[in-house]
Amino acid sequence: MKFTNLNNLSLVKLFLKVLVFVAVIFNVHAAEIDLNKILPMDNKITYGKLDNGVTYYVKNNQIPKNKAYVELVIKAGSLHENDDQQGLAHLLEHMAFNGTKSFPKNKIDSYLNSLGLSIGADFNASTGFTKTIYKFQVPTNTIEPLDTGVHILSEIASELTLEDEAFERERKIVEEEWRMDLGKFDRILEQQKPYIFKNSKYLVRDPIGKMEVIRNFKYQTAKDYYHQWYRPELMVVFIIGDIDQKKAEQIACELALHLLLQYN
């Protein structure tokens, strides 16, 4: 591109000078950072690791008022899939919305609606290369929603119903998600991936998976992934919000106890 206008040329020169300045400053500060130094824990956070391996973090944060954010992290994602499981970490995340032992079918949705909450806005999930995250936002003007929300997460971690008809529904939903991601930007990114992820497993483990696998996987193959990677020592629980910190810690420990009973 040619810049014939002097004002445009001046702007380009100014931009380049700023870019160089920022790069120099960044390098100076980067040189001062010890990347091996462990960051200190915020002393306002209560945390612990229980005997069954579950780690928890609890923090009181009064903004916004009367709300808490609860998150269950499974330290496994698409990089942990076998070749015949590509896309099943993500599909299993979808299965959490199809029922657990105490909340079969659409009972989770019904419970949320009774609190004025909804799937998507207040209960959601995501799957990445190295982790799968389930997250709740609940009111805390009474303790029951927080208690029940954590109980639902504990059942997602160990007692998904994984019914055949739900698997069939989710095949179609995941394929539709894949189809919606076939836009211009995504096609460009697809062309760049061999250069970005060269000689890396990231290149062949996109969380959306392979549609050949999604269309044809056996139910047991998905269940095998669930039982292999949804283990207490790979789970982290976060409870943050306008809460009684000791009570929230007790609830986190109850979740871990529930998992201990399920895995023994």
Language-model regions, residue ranges each:
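Histidine-acidic residue clusters that define the catalytic metal-binding segment
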Residues: 31-46, 194-235, 245
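Mature N-terminal segment immediately following signal peptide/propeptide cleavage
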Residues: 38-71
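Active-site-adjacent, His/Asp/Glu-enriched structural segments that form or flank metal-binding
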Residues: 74-89, 94-186, 223-234, 251-254
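Glycine-centered hinge/linker elements that transmit conformational signals in sensory
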Residues: 251-264
